[in-house]
Amino acid sequence: WKPQNQIDITTLNEAGSLQEAESIWEKHFILHHLKRNNWDIDETCKILKTSKKQFQKKLKYHSIEMPESEAPPSQKRYPQRTLKRSVVLCGSSLHSGIKTGLILQPMPAGSGIIFGDIASGKTIPAQLENVQSTDYSTCLKKGVNSVGTIEHIMATLHMYRVTNLLIKIGDEAPVMDGSAKDFCELLEDGEFEDQDDFYEEIVIDKSYSFGDKEKGEPYISIEPSEKFSVSYHMEYPEPIGVQDFTYEFDGDESFKKEIAPARTFGFMEEVAQLTKMGYASGGKLDNFILLGDKKVINTKLRFEDEFARHKILDILGDFYLLGKPIRGKIKAHKSGHTQNVGLLKKVRESLIEKN
């Protein structure tokens, strides 16, 4: 376990030896990060990239006592985050079919997530009020500029807790292989930088719902919980059938392993119709799961329940349009982007009234 950040510690002057100085420095380093993370051991271990068991040994060695009670969830503050350097990704768009790409550029604290049009330089904040459409993907628009299929990159930013970033892009995000796997690698390549300002999670304090589950309609709800989780139930024709999956956020590695690899999918009989409507023009055999004749046609599944996991990926992306990471339990029943955004509007209205 090695400290990675340096801080000014005047008490080092009191050290009688190099070993004693290192011990003093390490103790102050640990205290610095514990205070910065509201004495949350799990969050501190994640940032310092150490195990909880090893970290607790350090606490005992340095006689560091934890506060008797932690701050309530609604008062916990976390450092805002951006990237250390700009990174680039190239690919093709799923719906328009054109070659596209994006540039992720670090932004100062308080900037939020912003999409910037490469051609015009105009920007679109990744906010709920800028949602233009939810047909087969989530599309933002402000003025004459728009950007579509943002849900996969937004899900990745949400789960990696990146709060400030400029995404330079064209009309549509690249689909890559239909999952968020490449976006995870892109963010990690840019390296994360915690910033001096802080944010508080949006803590759900009551239940909200959208849709009528009793009538068999697509339905989604969110309720209070100590942790963030998403459960999804889907009912489709074969080969999908009935699938259920629950994802509980346990750091970005859990997202990278359990949700990010899940790919978008479509039925063969729908592809021709979608193309006529101006969608799926960029659909290729290597960027989505093609289904037909009650079987998967073009690939092997990465998970038995890959379809339900991908629906959760979409939810994670849509929910970051509230501007901050969320704490609550989401339950979805056959829902899509339209239901996700409908629920988000209810949550936002309540937050506005409360504030």
Name each model feature, range by range.
Residues W1-N5:
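Conserved C-terminal helix/linker of AAA+ ATPases
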Residues I7-A71:
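Bacterial C-terminal helix-turn-helix
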Residues A71-N164, K168-N355:
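C-terminal regulatory domains involved in ligand/effector binding and gene-expression control
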